[in-house]
Amino acid sequence: MRYDFSKTEKKWQARWKQQETFKTGEAPEKPKYYVLDMFPYPSGSGLHVGHLEGYTASDISARYRRSRGYNVLHPMGWDAFGLPAEQFAIKTGTHPSDTTQKNIANFKETLQAMGFSYDWSREINTTDPGYFQWTQWIFLKLHEMGLAYMSEVDVNWCVELRAVLANEEVEEKLADGLTVVRRPLRQWVLKITAYADRLLEDLDGLDWPENVKQMQRNWIGRSEGVEVDFELRCHRTMLRVYTTRPDTLFGATYLVISPEHAMAEKLATAQQLVAVKEYIAKAKLKTELERTGLQKDKTGVFTGSYAINPATGEPLPVWISDFVLTSYGTGAIMSVPAHDSRDWEFAKQYGLPIIEVVKSPHDVQQEVFEGKDSTVVNSSNNDISLNGLAFPEAFELMASWLEKKKAGKRKVNYRLRDWIFSRQRYWGEPIPIKHYPDGTLKPETSLPLMLPEVEAYQPTETGESPLANIPEWLNGTDENGPFRRETNTMPQWAGSCWYYLRFIDPHNSKLPVDPAKEAYWMNVDLYIGGAEHAVLHLLYARFWHKVLFDLKVVSTKEPFQRLFNQGMILGEDNEKMSKSRGNVIPADHVLQTYGADAVRLYEMFLGPLEQVKPWNTNGIEGISRFLSRVWRLVWPEPEGTRADLSTLAPSPDLLRRMHKTIKKVAADTENLKFNTAIAEMMVFTNELHRTGEGSRIAVETLLLLLAPYAPHLSEELWEALGHQESISLAPFPEFDPELAQDKEVTIAVQVNGKLRGSFTAAPGSPKEQLLNEAKALEGVKKFLEGVTIMKEIVVPDKLINFAVK
């Protein structure tokens, strides 16, 4: 009988669905394992083979953990609100709700065709009123706690999309060729900065890729420094700057303030006022990214005013430059051009003084020196001398001196800004707030607050949401009088901030999640998704989770204990898949051609899960041949005669090979090293064909190992061997440690690091026995004659090295 993957896969997918094989409930007597994918937004273009990689990895982990006796929660849902869904709807001329439902059906069909073991009874959709009523409820809790507030702020406005972008989104949109400008708008803002320290500190306990943790640390940007007051000549006030290098105060030769600084125009003298106003106007047209890029040309304008350096008493010119941001520190900096590259370039551009205050190995007039390892020079007055001190001591001494003189104070600052949360779009969760004529705000008392049914949902050019043009929804009256509903909607990130909790209890109409169920399932044991979400979704979700922890809605401080970022699968041309390049490989196409099991195995066999790798159609054909070889272990003849497998114990060599395979596949699957686990199963399959023993025990063991990876084929062969219960519910095989150990190991022998011979020995042989055998080797003896052995290094079961003199 030949393997018909299409017939087999449809058969088992239907049976899993009918028997609810993967439906999950709480089982306190079992250890739990919550494995989660970053759920997709259902775009109109459908899934390509790159999307399947992470989902396949999580499914293998889920199936493996079930076979190990865990109660596994492995759900799937749809992040369907927000800009991507709305853009697609506008492009196609259909309503977002219609396109979203159609796209979800398309995505779901593909995922089910892959045989993923999701518990579909827990499926969620962020646009479902039963879901977003709790998103709105969480927002109201944030508002109640003072963590959601309104503010007139300069925002990143995307001209083409007619939408506000979060700071974290700007770079991606600029890369797409879109225009982003700054403009003031009334916004809802979430006070994520109130949780900055906790977001930073709790990273240490997470099993996440270090690069992702570092990206979050950098984004939060905690720094310890000093706020220094510079007296402004002729203005009878102070200009406060923030610096992390108070030890370099003697080297400050000018000050720079941001174009948005409250004193920017006030500091302009009559002669400089026109130039200052022109510069400020130009700066407003630039994005933050354009202003702060390290490669950009440094621009600025002199205000005409001076401030007194508290350490030297010298007047310092006050400049305005767009590389300084009001949102960080005080919006004003002291510039020490000898020891900061940006300040050095600015000083060179405008002919400003450069004074060395940290001992440099070269001339600071010609090249900046930014090292902290040197000592302070040229830094003393009648009250204080920093000369000869290293950075930590100089920092402390200057900070204390400034505090004593009441000219400064220690300060902790963050790069992290509060999260601009509202969007001027239709397709998002309505913000459940009512505005009254006297300026008071009150929450909607009945949730969910639904979006109105409308025909025209395109964004406006004015910056107002389309909801502002629907008076019957916008205006109302209650016991407090007439009110106007909030017209901004939530961003696409809102629903994904807490979806992992709703999977635990998706049908609860009384609470976002039942406390007992949350306590059982949380936190997520394995979360798989792209690293591109490091400072967006992953940071936002951690923030909301901490708020919910404070509200006692959740019992854990963090949502995701282990994070794994899969590497990207490139097109066959080694480029990122995109429609513009024409190199997208649709998932449906390869599924129809090769089948789900082949796609699953191939994507995992391409290379380490975390690495970027190109798709190669020849490779998947090789995987198909491997599956056929497994099939022929049970159905060797095309005519349909099943193999007559022996119930006798395998031969000693095959038995040892089998236990080594179990050990290797188990360890690799546990550690997400799927490519090497598959390679090991290929070796074992070849061994089964080579020996021709026809051992039932060995073949069944192979199927149990293969089941998490190629579940359809494994189910079909398992049933063919007479098993009634699904292999998806069968326990993973155990290995015998003694049988899984090599009978002999090869010991390499080196003299001063150079290989001089080798020999075989039993694993775990005593050190003295190994040394004696090594010294007896002909190729080693001659290098030990007439020399003194200084050290004997023995690496058990691997290596001996003699250090001689």
Swiss-Prot record:
It is found in: Cytoplasm. GO terms for biological process: leucyl-tRNA aminoacylation. Keywords: Aminoacyl-tRNA synthetase, ATP-binding, Cytoplasm, Ligase, Nucleotide-binding, Protein biosynthesis. A motif ('HIGH' region) lies at residues 40-51. It catalyses: tRNA(Leu) + L-leucine + ATP = L-leucyl-tRNA(Leu) + AMP + diphosphate. The keyword Membrane does not apply. A motif ('KMSKS' region) lies at residues 576-580. Its EC number is 6.1.1.4. Signal peptide: none annotated. The keyword ATP-binding applies. CDD domains: Anticodon_Ia_Leu_BEm, LeuRS_core. One of its GO terms (cellular component) is cytosol. Belongs to the class-I aminoacyl-tRNA synthetase family. This is Leucine--tRNA ligase. The lineage of its organism: Bacteria, Pseudomonadati, Chlorobiota, Chlorobiia, Chlorobiales.
